[in-house]
């Protein structure tokens, strides 16, 4: 199965804010969509995270994208909407010590995110699809498929509006 994993365009939010599940809009959606439409095969089904920054792009790529909650970004719990500089140092250190397993207070861990993202992919029955989602979802999926140890996960970085195409064994 061929998947085109697309990170949403840049969100309209102040720099330095943790915004995982915050439902903020994105900037420059039509321009990003035009670029992707020129690159992607035509007529593919499109799935999207329900958050506006993904959904708006998905709606430019397909007249009726399918929305799936499993594609939403990691839940950062009490960190949501907080400046990264204001997140308690001890909590950030705990996350750095256990990149995959640590969950922010009231949130989920990257491993939890990875489980739901893999369940989404396992549910697909099409040979090729476009998935509009978030960096965390793309990162945990690629880390799984590439067999990367959790300490290497932060090396996987994706630009806003970027496309990563992978072939996933069934």
Feature map (PLM): residue ranges:
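Loop-to-helix element that buttresses phosphate recognition and phosphoryl-transfer chemistry
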Residues: 2-57, 105-117
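Generic beta-sheet signal
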Residues: 3, 44, 127-136
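Short, active-site-adjacent cap segments at secondary-structure transitions
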Residues: 12, 53-55, 73, 137-140
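Phosphate-coordination/substrate-recognition cap region in phosphate-metabolizing enzymes
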Residues: 33-91
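Active-site catalytic microenvironments for nucleophilic, acid-base chemistry
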Residues: 60, 123, 144-148
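Short glycine/proline- and acidic residue-enriched helix-loop micro-motifs
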Residues: 92-111
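Domain-level recognition of soluble alpha/beta enzyme cores
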Residues: 146-170
